[in-house]
Structure formats: structure tokens, C-alpha cells
Amino acid sequence: MLKLLGAVFIVVATTWTGFEMAKIYTERPRQIRQLRAALQSLEAEIMYGHTPLHTASQQIAKQLAQPVSTLFSAFSDQLDKGSDSAKTAWEQSLKKVWDTLSLKKSEYEVLKQFGETLGIHDRISQQKHIKLALTHLEASEADAEQAQAKNEKMIKSLGFLAGLLLILLLM
């Protein structure tokens, strides 16, 4: 009876580990979609609402789920504190929040390049830079969805199978 209970515990623990490891593949496309929605909202606020950047960032942060909302909240806070420029505020916010995101280096570079253009162009040029970032994020989203389809189920299965292997080795 005790061996059976231990075996069940091992399978549950390794399966849970597999699901947690697979969560990265689930979170990345979701966070990229949120970033795209945020940039589209930012574009609308800049182009049609004529909203200041810090106010638009606050509003966007309220609309998004964690951890992506934290990026825009931190950006708004940096701007409110009187950061040197929007570029500096964006970079500091991105560095602060980056470890909580499930994104790759390529998405970091897209967001960093986008931040370099924030607040230094007129509205039309800013809109073009937002659309460029959206295009890059769209390609990253397709890549993330492909990686999710390819790897998520395998990692979940490996967690379960690792538990079964461990049980067989211990018996």
C-alpha cells in the first residue's frame, strides 16, 4: 500500500513538473498577443485620442493581464517620475519586467527597438514605428504558436513518462 502511494505521488509530481515546463509554450503566444493588443491600443490613443504617453500607458496597463500590464504600468511610473526620455523610461521598464515574461530575446529586441522611437517622432512616424513593431510581433507570434504545437504536448507527456520510468527503476 505504501509503495502504491509513493508511486502515485511520483507520477503526480513528475506530471505536474511537465505541465509547469510546458506552461512556457502556452504563455509566450498569449503574452505576444497581449503586447500586440497593447501596441494597437497605444496607436489608437496616440493617433485619435491625442493622449499623452504616460496617460495612455496607464490606461493600457489597466486593460491588460499580468505580467504584460506591469510593463506599461512601470513605463507610466517612469514617465511620471520625470525620466530623461521616453526611450530611457521604456528601457528601464523593459529590463525591470523582462524576467517575469515568457518571451525570447527576439521579442526583447523588437520591444527595445520600438522603445528607441517612443516620443521622438510626430504622430504619423510614431504610427509607422508601431506598425513595424506589430509586424515583427506577428511573426514572433506565429513562431511561438508553431513551437507550442510542436513541443507542449511532448513536454507534458515526458513529465508523465518520466514518472513511470522512475517508478519502474525504483521497483
From Swiss-Prot:
**Pfam families recorded for this chain?**
Spore_III_AB (PF09548)
**GO terms classed as biological process:** sporulation resulting in formation of a cellular spore
InterPro entries attached to this UniProt entry: Spore_III_AB
Write out the entry's keywords from A to Z: Sporulation
Protein name per UniProt? Stage III sporulation protein AB
Q: Which gene encodes it?
A: spoIIIAB
